[in-house]
């Protein structure tokens, strides 16, 4: 059973979807069940992947990793997403951009911060 805000990936074509209406027993793409992505918080390479929140209560910046993540065609951060009490905000990134996002929200409303690396998958910080 899918749940709200879960991510799934197609192993055939690479499509990634986020559940906005929960309840489907499974998600299918390219004729095969999609794989649920589990967000990592620690692992080899965490210094380049775990989102870091910086800033005050009236706005903040999310940087990817304590060491800046590469942003090249074959290895980059695809998006940074924050889950707040009543909404979700996402910044999509491209190779060559700085792996960070600025948000004008209250830091105290953050439930979770996530990012997706094109090579190493989904990472989070609470």
Give names to the regions the model predicted:
Residues 63-64, 99-106:
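Exposed aromatic-hydrophobic patches
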Residues 7, 16, 26, 114:
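Residues immediately within or flanking Cys/His clusters that coordinate Zn2+
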């Amino acid at each position: 059973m899918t749940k709200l805000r879960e991510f799934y990936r197609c192993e055939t074509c690479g499509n990634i979807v986020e559940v906005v209406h929960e309840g489907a027993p499974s998600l299918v793409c390219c004729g095969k069940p999609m794989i649920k992505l589990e967000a990592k918080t620690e692992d080899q390479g965490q210094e380049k992947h775990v989102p870091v929140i910086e800033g005050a209560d009236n706005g903040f910046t999310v940087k990817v990793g304590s060491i800046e993540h590469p942003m090249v065609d074959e290895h980059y951060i695809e998006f940074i997403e924050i889950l707040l009490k009543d909404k979700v905000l996402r910044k999509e990134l491209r190779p060559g951009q700085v792996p960070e996002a600025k948000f004008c929200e209250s830091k105290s409303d953050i439930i979770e911060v996530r990012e997706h690396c094109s090579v190493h998958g989904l990472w989070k910080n609470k």
